[in-house]
């Protein structure tokens, strides 16, 4: 196989808590005000990273961001010492403090959209940090995300970085969670599929209950920035009816790997027409789409959302067959598990299931696919990645010790005003940037 898919998982931050901040994400809303366990959340994520690295997959780590985000609190009128800022925010607007303490950057599928060098006219890997315009607690992530990505992929001969799109609804961009790449080997030109929820200019249909976070206009802008060939680029609208049922990103209803698209029967608007265009464009690259469509009669949209069946990872094994990585919730649901078991026994491309317990992330609405950013790289590009962010035995031990030293095993919203939590977080992140060799990427380090 030419090239590699490298998954960069987000390390859960110290302020991981359940605040119900994400309207349209039903798991997030349902678990509002529950007590969280940041230490367990971080360790569950690390176990997934290490298990996949041990199986021979290329696996990296993306660090959490500084939270509470004191600079934004100051911008919004809170003043005095950092301790005073936190106390004022808790007294006057605890919901605002909660939003500015969110650990949502753990879901690195929303960190950026990435286009491999094989698809870009200049032969470079392109990164555009997502503006995450639809949710305030996420829109503040883009600047630090850009800095972290530049520190990890810092060789301009191989990597091109773009700032997030303008911070307005017209260009609402949720990153790789609404982006699929379909083709053959990772190192060869493929078709990029940008999925959107609404089209600002000339759109026909949009959801009515929950917001469509991604626009077609955002996808088109990223395709231009990344110098993609329109002959191998597809823009597909997600079915607005499933957005209104809690499918807030496309990776909650579909997932791809190489030439395989695993998706629900109701995933896309005018689905047959959309997939026909993907097939035609893949055919020009001598690649054939394998669409695995799950019928509503087997798995309802509600069950897909509850179990995160499609918020899974599909990984290509050395023998060419594929493995699907699902959360424990998929195994606990008899109908979903029955479907998965039949699928892997059917002789198709996916012949193995791997299950992970990601309960802390799942209760906030993020499964295996949410936690990772896919980056397809060739041999030279992989060598140019900052090696200290790549998972191995040594890094796994170091990061677990780091979590043990700094993380709490119980956190509620009231704890967010604790100045000691802020100090713990800054000390932890200062140490982490040394471990991962990132330099000064956080506001408090500037």
Curated annotation (Swiss-Prot):
The active site is at residues 174, 249, 370. InterPro entries: AstB_sf, SuccinylArg_d-Hdrlase_AstB. GO terms for molecular function: N-succinylarginine dihydrolase activity. Its EC number is 3.5.3.23. It catalyses: N(2)-succinyl-L-arginine + 2 H2O + 2 H(+) = N(2)-succinyl-L-ornithine + 2 NH4(+) + CO2. Keywords: Arginine metabolism, Hydrolase. One of its GO terms (biological process) is arginine catabolic process to succinate. Substrate binds at residues 19-28, 110, 137-138, 213, 251, 364. It is an enzyme of class 3 (hydrolase). Pathway: Amino-acid degradation; L-arginine degradation via AST pathway; L-glutamate and succinate from L-arginine: step 2/5. Catalyzes the hydrolysis of N(2)-succinylarginine into N(2)-succinylornithine, ammonia and CO(2). Homodimer. Belongs to the succinylarginine dihydrolase family. This is N-succinylarginine dihydrolase. The gene is astB.
